[in-house]
């Protein structure tokens, strides 16, 4: 099935649409993605290990949930859809965290991130994810820069830490 996603300007205005595959071949085609940081009650962050079959960053630990916003879809609707598709989680509350931009040689994304607290059973999508695990924040900090995480997750994690430390002040 061909997946269309909206193409946007730097300031997130929709200017067209393109196939997902086209967006991954052309970093000038800025598109939207939704991410969710899933925490448990102990304050541990769930990370997913990307399937070795993925075309981008296979086998690396990544944000709890992440996916493209479909053409005509809202960030929030995409976040809930991806949460259910990737982890089998539904009927939870998502809290907005922040927006940020991710740019690299492969693609350009305007990302909206959400927070979710969840302690229930997780039935992850084994076609997209090889493994899931809750991590202590200090453990993630120690591993930053070691090559086990996707560069995008490391960017996201730093943003989250900055937001949390700013809110404590």
Regions found by a protein language model. Name each.
Residues 42, 52, 74-76, 84-122:
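Active-site segment of metal-dependent pyrophosphate-handling enzymes
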Residues 26-28, 56-60, 134-136:
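A short, polar/proline- and glycine-enriched secondary-structure boundary/capping micro-motif
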Residues 22, 71, 98, 105-169:
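Nudix hydrolase/Nudix homology domain
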Residues 33-65:
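A glycine-rich, hydrophobic loop/mini-helix early in the fold
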Residues 1-35, 41:
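Acidic, metal-coordinating catalytic segment for phosphate/diphosphate chemistry
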């Amino acid at each position: 099935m061909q997946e269309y996603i909206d193409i946007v300007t730097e300031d997130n205005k929709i200017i067209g649409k393109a196939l997902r595959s086209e967006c991954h071949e052309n970093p000038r085609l800025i598109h939207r993605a939704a991410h969710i940081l899933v925490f448990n009650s102990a304050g541990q962050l769930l990370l997913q290990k990307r399937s070795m079959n993925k075309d981008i960053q296979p086998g690396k630990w990544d944000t709890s949930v992440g996916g493209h916003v479909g053409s005509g879809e809202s960030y929030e609707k995409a976040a809930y859809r991806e949460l259910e598709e990737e982890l089998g989680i539904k009927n939870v509350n998502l809290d907005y965290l922040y927006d940020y931009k991710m740019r690299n040689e492969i693609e350009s994304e305007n990302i909206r991130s959400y927070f979710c607290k969840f302690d229930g059973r997780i039935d992850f999508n084994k076609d997209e994810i090889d493994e899931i695990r809750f991590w202590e924040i200090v453990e993630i900090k120690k591993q930053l820069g070691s090559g086990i995480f996707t560069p995008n997750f490391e960017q996201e994690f730093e943003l989250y830490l900055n937001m949390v430390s700013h809110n404590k002040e």
